[in-house]
Amino acid sequence: MIPINISPATVVLCGSIVTVSIAYVIFVVGHRRKGFPPGPPTLPVIGNIHQLPTTGAHFKFTEWAQKYGGIYSLKLGTGTALVITDREIVKKLMDKKSSITSDRPPSYVSYDLITKGDHLLVMHYNETWRKIRKYMHQFFRESECEKKHITLQDAEATQMMLEFLETPDNHNLHTKRFSNSIISTLLFGLRTPTYDSPHAKHLYDIMERWSAVMEPGNTPPVDIYPIFKYIPESLFGNWISRASGVGRDMERLYANMISQFKIRAEDPKISRTHESFFDILLREQEKTREFTDHEIAFIGGVQLEGGSDTSASILTAFVQAMVNWPEVQRVAQEEIDRVIGEDRSPTWNDFAALPYINAIMKETHRWRPVTPLSFPHCLTKDEYLDGFLLPKGATIILNVWGIQNDESVYPRPEEFDPSRFKDHKLLAPEYAVSDWKLRDHYSFGVGRRICPGIHLAERNVWLGVAKLLWAFKFEKATGADGQPIEMNVDPKTGYTEGFLHCALPFKCKVTVRSEERRKTILKEFELAKQVFNEYTG
């Protein structure tokens, strides 16, 4: 063996490096830097990781906001998260500074394992993201919704009335079919005539699994401590296999829907009056080849997901609210009956004449947001806000639940009270760009990441609310003893866990308001079937 001569100076130097490194880890990693927004006390190395709940993080974040303010910081190992629970700060940072707050933080689970980075929700703020958004904006902008898409939306809402009439016990499935059929038809010319349609059932299964995987605590903090990639996943609930499985099923479903669309597009027996999104996108793709096949599949997938879940979950929460607050239901039906008779159901042309319906829609978004914590943003440069240093690379979490349950803005926030929005006569897109004091809710996101389907979604929900209230009375179901069955509307126990929140299945009594309205529903559904043929061929 060749002897190694190490000088005393080298030994001292190496020892000093080790000592300094250990001291750095102990006294710096996990600690909040001076000038950062305040937050809960930290521990060396891990920061606040040990304090993060595995479920219902938005409740804890709201509790901390009451103590530490509208913006506070959490230390996650070497990283920093900023939690915003203040509407004015949202406007200052997320809207007015959107050029530096529109990126996404690293996510090994959602970016690498599940979507390979091609899903618009997790995609970084780059040129590909801008190209995809441009296509979506052009197809779903307000003028297109007004001129073209609203006809289909009205027809699908009419079928939903028929479904509530015929099988009221399946009301939670009818709202899902309704919203999925609209977006699937507009994207692919493929309707969802029943909830049992394979593409719809498969999609909702995937979304439920993805939501569960993305719940904080369901996977190890691999973005903070990459060593978790190399520890046997069986110690953490096979998290890699679960996430990868969701990604494979996503890709398989979305690619198959593109393939089936191409087959139908080449079938001479199918003649559609209205072009779908993919008629336009694939025609452009033939010229430019600007997207990969995987990107194309996920361009469809992200819109299917967004268009299928939010509207359905909001309509389900609306039904809950009508059962539990019958006075709200009574006031809404009185407004409808003053404007519309029994010989027709409400249409989008009635929007201005039914402001209370708009208020109900806004209050439902506020009362039970589908995403109580919006998908995280990432700060791309240092920024100063109200005297605080917000560091480059920080993860930004918008605490939608906390903002929309702020008692200083919404007294008795657990009460469903549409009168909060009696002066809000416009739709959500108008308030998203207005003064922060007028913002109605944050269901569609903020800044440059605001949902590109916002105009479609607003019309989905408004039509659903208006037609269902015109047609039906919603009451508590009764048990075998003849007593009303109380509904669990507790956001902690009556709703699903995960990134997306929806009411757990519940029973209620749905009764058509008159025989004349029943006949009108049947008559309007016959007309709706003609509309479906125009979109599907």
From Swiss-Prot:
Pathway stated in the Swiss-Prot or TrEMBL entry: Secondary metabolite biosynthesis; terpenoid biosynthesis
Keyword terms of this UniProt record: Glycoprotein, Heme, Iron, Membrane, Metal-binding, Monooxygenase, Oxidoreductase, Transmembrane, Transmembrane helix
Transmembrane regions listed in the UniProt entry: 9-29
UniProt topology in membrane: Single-pass membrane protein
Gene Ontology CC: one annotated term: membrane
GO BP field: terpenoid biosynthetic process
Sites where a glycan is attached: 126
Family annotation (InterPro entries): Cyt_P450 (IPR001128), Cyt_P450_CS (IPR017972), Cyt_P450_E_grp-I (IPR002401), Cyt_P450_sf (IPR036396), Cytochrome_P450_fung (IPR050364)
Gene3D superfamilies on file: Cytochrome P450 (1.10.630.10)
Induction of synthesis: Expression is down-regulated by the cluster-specific transcription factor AOL_s00215g275. Expression is also down-regulated by the HOG1-MAPK pathway downstream transcription factor MSN2.
Localization, UniProt: Membrane
Cofactor requirements of the protein: heme
Annotated residues for binding of heme: 451
EC number(s) given by UniProt: 1.-.-.-
Biological role: Cytochrome P450 monooxygenase; part of the gene cluster that mediates the biosynthesis of sesquiterpenyl epoxy-cyclohexenoids (SECs) such as anthrobotrisins and arthrosporols, metabolites that possess a novel hybrid carbon skeleton consisting of a polyketide-derived epoxycyclohexenol combined with a terpenoid-derived monocyclic sesquiterpenol substructure (PKS-PTS hybrid). The SEC pathway plays an important role for fungal soil colonization via decreasing fungal nematode-capturing ability.
Protein name per UniProt: Cytochrome P450 monooxygenase AOL_s00215g282
Source organism of this protein record: Arthrobotrys oligospora (strain ATCC 24927 / CBS 115.81 / DSM 1491)
